[in-house]
Every structure is written in C-alpha cells, then in structure tokens.
C-alpha cells in the first residue's frame, strides 16, 4: 500500500494544497473492543480526521477506520457493495451501454448448461479481485474444471465472451459522473487488457456515449471516483466492470491529465 503510485500521487497533490494526507496500512491497524472503541495504528491511537480515501477493499478494519472521518471517498456503503462484480451487473442499467449475458455459479457448474446460455467461449471472473487476477477464458469443459481447485464455496461470475473486444478495452476515469480521463488498453498476447498484465495504454477520446455512461454510473452508485471498463461491441460499448478504487498510473501517463489533482480539488470543494 505504502509503495503504490496512486497513494503517493494523492499525498503529493494533497500537500500541494496544504492538506496533510497520511497513508495508513490496514495491516498496521488494531481495533479495540466495544468498551474501548479506539483504533490503533502500530500501537498509537488514531485521531478523528476530516476525510478518508478508501484504497483497500478487504475486511472490517477499513470499515472502522471510516468511523474516524467526517466524509469517506468513496462512501463506504457503495464502496463495499460495488467491489463485487455480480452486484455491478445486477444493479447497473443504462441505455448507453449493453451488458454481457451472465450467470452466477461455482466452479462445479455444468459446462453444457453454461455454454447453452452463454456460448461455448465464456469468461469466468472472481467476484472481488482486480488487475486481471481470477479472470479466466473458458473454452472447454477442462477449463471449467480447473476452477474446482478454488473449492465449492468460491462463486464465479460467468459472462459471454465479447469477441470484438479481444485483448482491448477502454478505461474511463470518472469524478462524480464527469469524464476526466479516458484510455484504451491493448494486449497483444492476452484476452485481458489489464495494465498490470502488461497491456499498453494510449489516450482515447471520450464521446457522448462514454459521457452518458459515466453520468449513469455515478447517479446509480454515488461513487465519487470510478474507473469504468468498457468492452468494444459492434455498435455500442458493453459494460465490463467498474472499479471502486481505480489506479492512477496508467490514466495519468496515457492522458497527461493530473487526475490526482482533480480528485483533491473535488475533496477540497466539500469542505
């Protein structure tokens, strides 16, 4: 966490605006019992603060840290809800985008049934991972059986494969529904277009459809900062997923936009 590009960029831009912003590692946190509801970081009590920027998605300690703040970015309730990829497809609706056909199941699901609903080529996604982890292309029964190593308690989101978007997608960075940066990610060797997996990035000019999508996602989720991943369809974009804590390195390098600065300007405007 402490070495992450995004965290350090936010600290840098906060400092430029006279704001003291500190990186707190969740694994350094201890939460007291109900009779002593203090929160400790490396043994020291954390004091109340004006705001928290959530950059960690797991567990309950981060929820308790949010109790210290007057405001949270992103707000904790939609942050926790929309971490989950199934929740995203279940609730987000807009005429501006299409959604892949999808099913929720474990890795022991019946391949003939899944393929009859989604096509013989499909994508299996873990519900809460990012950066391309737990994303698999399923083309035959053996590919599906490989998911069984994760156990029956592991649920997967199965989606139809959008062939027109093989190895490429568009990442939109939205601040309260306004598009502040947009890039195309492209991989020459993988169906996944994640920067963390080596995909290249170039600036992408947002059109009215993309702006409508960003506005719809904000209005439906209340997420202040959102990375919206779109797949290329024949006529319209498909919603791939949204990211509740999107990284800044790729989008800032591809577009030259000071996204971290725009984020801090928005936060300053709330106080």
Cite the ranges covered by each PLM segment:
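Protein kinase-like catalytic core scaffold
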Residues: 122, 180-181, 226, 238-240
């Amino acid at each position: 966490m402490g070495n992450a590009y995004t965290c350090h960029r936010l600290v840098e831009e906060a400092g430029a605006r006279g704001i003291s912003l500190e990186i707190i590692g969740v694994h350094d946190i201890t939460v007291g019992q109900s009779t002593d509801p203090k929160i400790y970081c490396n043994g020291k009590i954390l004091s109340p603060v004006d705001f928290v920027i959530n950059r960690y998605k797991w567990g309950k300690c981060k929820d308790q840290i949010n109790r210290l703040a007057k405001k949270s970015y992103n707000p904790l309730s939609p942050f926790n809800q929309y971490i989950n990829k199934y929740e995203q497809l279940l609730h987000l609706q807009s005429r501006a985008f299409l959604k892949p056909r999808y099913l929720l199941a474990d890795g022991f699901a019946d391949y003939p049934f899944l393929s009859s609903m989604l096509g013989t080529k499909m994508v299996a996604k873990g519900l809460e991972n990012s950066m391309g982890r737990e994303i698999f292309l399923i083309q035959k029964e053996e590919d599906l059986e490989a998911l069984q190593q994760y156990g029956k308690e592991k649920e997967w989101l199965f989606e139809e494969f959008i062939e027109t978007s093989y190895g490429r997608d568009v990442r939109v960075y939205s601040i309260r529904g306004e598009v502040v940066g947009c890039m195309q990610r492209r991989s020459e060797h993988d169906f996944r277009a994640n920067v963390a997996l080596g995909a290249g990035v170039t600036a992408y000019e947002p059109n009215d459809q993309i702006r409508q999508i960003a506005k719809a996602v904000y209005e439906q989720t209340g997420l202040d900062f959102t990375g919206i991943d779109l797949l290329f369809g024949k006529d319209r974009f498909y919603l791939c997923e949204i990211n509740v804590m999107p990284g800044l390195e790729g989008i800032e390098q591809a577009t030259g936009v000071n996204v971290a600065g725009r984020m801090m300007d928005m936060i300053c405007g709330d106080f």
